[in-house]
A protein has these predicted regions:
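Structural motif
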Residues: 46, 55, 74-76, 83, ...
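Conserved short histidine dyad/triad with adjacent acidic residue
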Residues: 32-33, 46-62
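A cytosolic small-molecule/anion-sensing beta-strand core signal
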Residues: 43, 71-72, 87-88, 106, ...
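A short, N-terminal "cap"/entry segment at the start of jelly-roll beta-barrel domains
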Residues: 1-48
Length: 123
C-alpha cells in the first residue's frame, strides 16, 4: 500500500441475508486512504465494497480468484505483463496466483467478489 495512504479492511460480514445493503451510508463514514468492508456472504464467496485512492501493494492470492467491479471512478490493475484500466460499470477477474497491484488516481468505489477464505492483503 502507498505509505501515504490510510487503509482498513473489515472482513466481518456487515449485512445478513434478506437485509437491505446500503453502501452509500457506509461510504459516508470513510474519509481517506483505502477502506474495504465485507458486505455479505453468498455461498462460498464474499462481496466487499472498497473505496479510496492511492496504490495498494503488489500481492497475490494463492487459492482464490478475485473479481473487481468499478462502481465509480477509475481503477488501474497492474499485472506483471500488462496494465488494465477500468471505468464505471467495468469488471475484471484476476486468477488465483497472479501477482497484481491495484491503484486509483482519484477516489474510486469498487465491488470485489472473492472466496470467503481470502486474505484481502494477499498471501
Amino acid at each position: 500500500m502507498d505509505t501515504n495512504s490510510v487503509h482498513s479492511h473489515n472482513t466481518e460480514v456487515a449485512f445478513d441475508p434478506l437485509e437491505v445493503i446500503d453502501t452509500h451510508r457506509l461510504q459516508e463514514k470513510w474519509q481517506e486512504g483505502w477502506v474495504s468492508q465485507t458486505l455479505c456472504q453468498v455461498n462460498d464467496c464474499v462481496v466487499r465494497l472498497g473505496a479510496g485512492h492511492g496504490k495498494f501493494h503488489w500481492h497475490k492470492h494463492d487459492n482464490e480468484d478475485e473479481f473487481f467491479y468499478v462502481v465509480e471512478g477509475r481503477l488501474i490493475i497492474n499485472l506483471n505483463e500488462r496494465t488494465v484500466e477500468l471505468g464505471p460499470q467495468q469488471g475484471f477477474t484476476v486468477p488465483r496466483g497472479v501477482i497484481h497491484c491495484t491503484e486509483a488516481l482519484e477516489r474510486t468505489v469498487i465491488l470485489m467478489v472473492e472466496g470467503s477464505t481470502v486474505t484481502p492483503t494477499g498471501d
